[in-house]
């Protein structure tokens, strides 16, 4: 009789465990599906928000660049050969100003005369500066007509960039060239994916805790 009772207890215990597993599985699967869809939704919305935030940050950084250049010299933009000047100040000889801006903000800066890059913190794979190359004519035209241009997939020397362009203007209102600020898309995506990963981990942990208290 004692053995029979023990078997019954064991059977009931197994039934209880099986029931608990069924409850957990029934609860966990929908939660995992919910977490997956929530993660995809966050990613979709996040990409859009990321673009808008980058556009705002790059636009703000151009204002900072312009203010810095105004302090350096109040003169108009001009060129002498392959040298870019603002007033009497030779920007091409002092590109360390742009390098310092990049070091402090993580953003690259380029100054162009018309569509030709004359001074930049952008460096090619061989270590030389990305000067003497051309900015697309349609970008220049868009800035001339609309005042600015934002792009999330600008390709420079084979690398994609988030970029924002505005005009470089002389005292008479004429547009002498362009000012560009940008960040490599890979760097932006790395920052965004890191935040997304943390959010998903938090949601998974939350789902596990929810299952434990069902």
Q: What role is predicted for each listed range?
A:
Residues 1-17:
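Non-catalytic regulatory/interaction regions at protein termini and inter-domain linkers
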Residues 15-45, 200-214:
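Extreme N-terminal signal-anchor transmembrane helix of membrane signaling/transducer proteins, especially
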Residues 41-76, 183:
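Membrane-proximal extracytoplasmic alpha-helices
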Residues 56, 60-72, 96-118, 148-151:
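Short N-terminal helix-loop-first-beta-strand/juxtamembrane motif that initiates sensory/input modules
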Residues 92-106, 119-156:
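Extracytoplasmic/periplasmic sensor domains and loops in membrane signaling proteins
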Residues 148-151, 158-168:
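A short beta-strand signature within small-molecule sensing/ligand-binding domains used
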Residues 158, 169-172, 180-197:
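Helix-start (N-cap) segments at beta->loop->alpha junctions
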Residues 175:
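Glycine-rich acetyl-CoA-binding "A-motif" of GNAT/NAT acetyltransferases
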